[in-house]
C-alpha cells in the first residue's frame, strides 16, 4: 500500500548479500528548506507532489519516509586509470519506489552525511554542485538522453567547508538503479563467485529481463550494457556534452548518465575540449569519450570472465571478441546520428566526407557547435559572417544537393534536424551565473529562468534568445570543478 505521500517502497537491493552495502541512516540537518522541487517528476513517480512540497524534512534526513530502509552502497572505481575502493561516501539510498506502472526507481539523498565509506570526507554537499546536478540532469532528460533525474534540492541551513564556507544542500536523486561498473569491480574483488553471480542475476532481472535464460548470461549482459553505453555516448556527442569524470564508478549498468560534478557543454567545436580542473591530461576530453567508454567496458568484462567460461583463455577470447566490436557498433550509430543532425535520409558514399568536412570547417573557424547545426535549418545560406566564406558556401552547396537527393521531401529533413539539434543547451556561463546567484545572493531567479528555457530545448521560442548566445569573452568558463 502506498503511504500518505504516494511512496511505495520495495527495497530489493538490500536483499542482496550484505557485502554490497551497509545500513546507514542519513544525518539530520539544522533547518531544511526546499530550493527546488520537481513537481513533474514527483507525479511521474506516483507521488503527491503538492503534499510533499511542504515537507523538506523527508528530503534532508530529518525524518524517514515510511517503508524506507536506508543503505550506503559499496563499489570500486578506476579513477583516471587507478582502481580505488569507494562506496557511497556522502549518499544514502532511501529505497526503491514503484511507480504506477510498476517501474522501479532508486530514491537517493546525496549530501546526507557521513557513511561507512566516507573515509576522510564530511559526507556533505554544497548548494552550487547540487544545483548543477539538478540543472544538468533535467536538461539531459529534456534532450531525450538517458539520465538520472533530480527530485529536489534542499538547503540544510548548515555550512560546508571546501575552499571557503559554503551553504549546504542535499540533492534527491532518482535513478533506474545505482548499479555501476564499479559495483561489479567491488563484487569481483571479494573473490566470492556466489556474490558475483547474484549481482549478475539481479542486474539482469532489474534492467535486462529479456536476457533471463540466456545460454551465457554474463556475456549476454556485457553485450547489452555495451549497446546501452554506446547509445548514451552517441547522444552525448550529439549535443556536445562532456561528462568530465568518466570513471568506472560513473558508468551505470542501466545506461543512464550519472554524476555531473565537472561536466560541461561544448561551445566552440574542438574534439580536444576539456573543462574538468582535475583532467590534466585530457583523458575525458569530448573526443575521447567513445574510447574511454570502451576502456571502461573492458574493466566491466574483466569482472565477468569467470562467469563467461570456466576456461580462462576461452573467457578472455569471448570478452575480447565482443569488446572489439565496440568500434564498429559505435561508428555505425554515430554516423546515423550525424546523418540525422544533417537531415540525411538513406546513405550515400559521400556522406562521411560531407560530415567530416563540416566538422573540419567548424574546428578551424571556432564555430559554435550547437548554433551551427541549428543555423543550417534556415532557408538558404545561414546568417552570420562565418558562413560567408568560400569554404563554407561550397560545403553548403554540396549539402543542399545531397538533401535534394533524399528519399523524402525537404520538410522531412528539416523536421529531422529540428528534433536532433537543440536550440538551447545549459551553456556553461549561464549555469555558473545561476549557481553564483543562488549561492552568494540567495537568488534563485536565474536558476528558475534557466530551467524554464531548458525544458523545451528543441523549440523555437523568442523568449529563449539569450540562452542561445555563446558566452562573451568576459563570461567564458574555462574550468569546472567536481565540488566534493
UniProtKB/Swiss-Prot annotation:
Keyword field: ATP-binding, Magnesium, Manganese, Metal-binding, Nucleotide-binding, Nucleotidyltransferase, Transferase
Residues annotated as binding ATP: 87, 89-90, 110, 122-123, 173, 180, 259
InterPro entries noted in UniProt: SelO (IPR003846)
Pfam families: SelO
Active site: 249 (proton acceptor)
Catalytic activities: L-seryl-[protein] + ATP = 3-O-(5'-adenylyl)-L-seryl-[protein] + diphosphate; L-threonyl-[protein] + ATP = 3-O-(5'-adenylyl)-L-threonyl-[protein] + diphosphate; L-tyrosyl-[protein] + ATP = O-(5'-adenylyl)-L-tyrosyl-[protein] + diphosphate; L-histidyl-[protein] + UTP = N(tele)-(5'-uridylyl)-L-histidyl-[protein] + diphosphate
E.C. numbers: 2.7.7.-, 2.7.7.108
Binding site for Mg(2+): 250, 259
Entry's Gene Ontology molecular function annotations: AMPylase activity; ATP binding; magnesium ion binding
Keyword Magnesium on entry: yes
Cofactor: Mg(2+); Mn(2+)
Keyword Nucleotide-binding included in the entry's annotation: yes
Family: Belongs to the SELO family.
NCBIfam families for this protein: PRK00029.1
HAMAP family per record: YdiU_SelO
Function in brief: Nucleotidyltransferase involved in the post-translational modification of proteins. It can catalyze the addition of adenosine monophosphate (AMP) or uridine monophosphate (UMP) to a protein, resulting in modifications known as AMPylation and UMPylation.
Identification of the protein by name: Protein nucleotidyltransferase YdiU
The species this protein was found in: Alcanivorax borkumensis (strain ATCC 700651 / DSM 11573 / NCIMB 13689 / SK2)
Gene behind the chain: ydiU
Amino acid at each position: 500500500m502506498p503511504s500518505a505521500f504516494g511512496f511505495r517502497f520495495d527495497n530489493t537491493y538490500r536483499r542482496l548479500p550484505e557485502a554490497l552495502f551497509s545500513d546507514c541512516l542519513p544525518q539530520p540537518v539544522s533547518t531544511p528548506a526546499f530550493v527546488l522541487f520537481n513537481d513533474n517528476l514527483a507525479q511521474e513517480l506516483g507521488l503527491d507532489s503538492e503534499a510533499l512540497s511542504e515537507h523538506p524534512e523527508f528530503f534532508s534526513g530529518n525524518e524517514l519516509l515510511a517503508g524506507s530502509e536506508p543503505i550506503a552502497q559499496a563499489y570500486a572505481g578506476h579513477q583516471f586509470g587507478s582502481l580505488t575502493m569507494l562506496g557511497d561516501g556522502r549518499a544514502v539510498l532511501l529505497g526503491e519506489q514503484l511507480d504506477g506502472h510498476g517501474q522501479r526507481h532508486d530514491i537517493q539523498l546525496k549530501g546526507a552525511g557521513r557513511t561507512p565509506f566516507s573515509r576522510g570526507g564530511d559526507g556533505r554537499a554544497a548548494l552550487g554542485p547540487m544545483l548543477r546536478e539538478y540543472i544538468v540532469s533535467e536538461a539531459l532528460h529534456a534532450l531525450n538522453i538517458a539520465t538520472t533525474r533530480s527530485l529536489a534540492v534542499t538547503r540544510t541551513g548548515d555550512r560546508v567547508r571546501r575552499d571557503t564556507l559554503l551553504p549546504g544542500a542535499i540533492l534527491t536523486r532518482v535513478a533506474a538503479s545505482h548499479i555501476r561498473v564499479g559495483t561489479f569491480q567491488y563484487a569481483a574483488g571479494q573473490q566470492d563467485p556466489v556474490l558475483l553471480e547474484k549481482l549478475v542475476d539481479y542486474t539482469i532481472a532489474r534492467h535486462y529481463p529479456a536476457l533471463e535464460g540466456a545460454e551465457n548470461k554474463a556475456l549476454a549482459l556485457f553485450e547489452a550494457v555495451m549497446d546501452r553505453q554506446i547509445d548514451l555516448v552517441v547522444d552525448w556527442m550529439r549535443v556536445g556534452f562532456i561528462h568530465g569524470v568518466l570513471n568506472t564508478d560513473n558508468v551505470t549498468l542501466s545506461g543512464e548518465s550519472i554524476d555531473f560534478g565537472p561536466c560541461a557543454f561544448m561551445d566552440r567545436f574542438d574534439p580536444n575540449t576539456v573543462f574538468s580542473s582535475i583532467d590534466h591530461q585530457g583523458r575525458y576530453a569530448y573526443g575521447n569519450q567513445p574510447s574511454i567508454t570502451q576502456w571502461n567496458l573492458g574493466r566491466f568484462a574483466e569482472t565477468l570472465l569467470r562467469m563467461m567460461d570456466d576456461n580462462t583463455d576461452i573467457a578472455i577470447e569471448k570478452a575480447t571478441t565482443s569488446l572489439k566490436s565496440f568500434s564498429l557498433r559505435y561508428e555505425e550509430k554515430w554516423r546515423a546520428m550525424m546523418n540525422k543532425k544533417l537531415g540525411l535520409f538513406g546513405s550515400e558514399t559521400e556522406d562521411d566526407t560531407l560530415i567530416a568536412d563540416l566538422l573540419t570547417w567548424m574546428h578551424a573557424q571556432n564555430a559554435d557547435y550547437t548554433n551551427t547545426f541549428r543555423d543550417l535549418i534556415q532557408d538558404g545560406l545561414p546568417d552570420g559572417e562565418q558562413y560567408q566564406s568560400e569554404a563554407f558556401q561550397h560545403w553548403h552547396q554540396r549539402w543542399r544537393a545531397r538533401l535534394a537527393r533524399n528519399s523524402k521531401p525537404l520538410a522531412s529533413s528539416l523536421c529531422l534536424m529540428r528534433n536532433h539539434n537543440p536550440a538551447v543547451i545549459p551553456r556553461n556561463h549561464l549555469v555558473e551565473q545561476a549557481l553564483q546567484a543562488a549561492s552568494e545572493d540567495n537568488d534563485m531567479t536565474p536558476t528558475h529562468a534557466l530551467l524554464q528555457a531548458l525544458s523545451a530545448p528543441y523549440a523555437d521560442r523568442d523568449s529563449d534568445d539569450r540562452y542561445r548566445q555563446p558566452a562573451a569573452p568576459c563570461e567564458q568558463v574555462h574550468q569546472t570543478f567536481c565540488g566534493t
